[in-house]
Amino acid sequence: MTKGTTSFGKRHNKSHTQCRRCGRKSYHIQKKTCSSCGYPSARLRKYNWSEKAKRRRTTGTGRMLHLKRVHRRFKQGFRSGPPKPVKA
């Protein structure tokens, strides 16, 4: 059995499938871990040796829907309850 070009033609099994957390095709079926985000680990996989990868998926690259709302409420002092009546 050769170990070069001829044996590469025999590779047809999928080792990775789509990850349910990050959506990338990096979830290893046998290991049951994602090589991209580290799922099922609670913490997201990130390393300092890949600064560019950290930049791609850090806070601010998405819609930031929740953080935008929190920031707006912070500026108003987290007001809650019914609005105060306007004095004439």
From Swiss-Prot:
Binds to the 23S rRNA. GO terms for cellular component: cytosolic large ribosomal subunit. Residues 1-24 are annotated as: Disordered. Its cofactor is Zn(2+). Keywords: Metal-binding, Ribonucleoprotein, Ribosomal protein, RNA-binding, rRNA-binding, Zinc, Zinc-finger. Residues 9-24 have a biased composition (Basic residues). Pfam families: Ribosomal_L37e. One of its GO terms (biological process) is translation. GO terms for molecular function: rRNA binding; structural constituent of ribosome; zinc ion binding. A zinc finger (C4-type) spans 19-37. Coiled coil: none annotated. Zn(2+) binds at residues 19, 22, 34, 37. Belongs to the eukaryotic ribosomal protein eL37 family. The gene is RPL37. It comes from Schistosoma mansoni. InterPro entries: Ribosomal_eL37, Ribosomal_eL37/eL43, Ribosomal_eL37_CS, Ribosomal_zn-bd. This is Large ribosomal subunit protein eL37. Binds 1 zinc ion per subunit.
